[in-house]
Amino acid sequence: MSKDQQSFEEMMQELENIVQKLDNETVSLEESLELYQRGMKLSATCDATLKDAEKKVNQLIKDEAEDEENGKEVNE
């Protein structure tokens, strides 16, 4: 799977690995900058994925509430 096609869980794992590497004092400045940039990209992608999931859950809850309301109206 390419980096652009990683699952949310894979991206989070890579992000955790990046944080661990950045905590390592032996990482060069150049590598630190590359890791930081990759981490920021992963963070933004994970954030967008979570927001999209939240929207879907909220829509499902709204749809369920509307279905229940419509069901009550039909039964009344």
UniProtKB/Swiss-Prot annotation:
One of its GO terms (molecular function) is exodeoxyribonuclease VII activity. One of its GO terms (cellular component) is exodeoxyribonuclease VII complex. Keywords: Cytoplasm, Exonuclease, Hydrolase, Nuclease. It catalyses: Exonucleolytic cleavage in either 5'- to 3'- or 3'- to 5'-direction to yield nucleoside 5'-phosphates. Belongs to the XseB family. Heterooligomer composed of large and small subunits. It is found in: Cytoplasm. The lineage of its organism: Bacteria, Bacillati, Bacillota, Bacilli, Bacillales. This is Exodeoxyribonuclease 7 small subunit. NCBIfam families: PRK00977.1-4 (NF002140), PRK14068.1 (NF010671), xseB (TIGR01280). Its EC number is 3.1.11.6. It comes from the Bacteria. It is an enzyme of class 3 (hydrolase). The gene is xseB. SUPFAM superfamilies: XseB-like. Bidirectionally degrades single-stranded DNA into large acid-insoluble oligonucleotides, which are then degraded further into small acid-soluble oligonucleotides. One of its GO terms (biological process) is DNA catabolic process. It comes from Staphylococcus haemolyticus (strain JCSC1435).
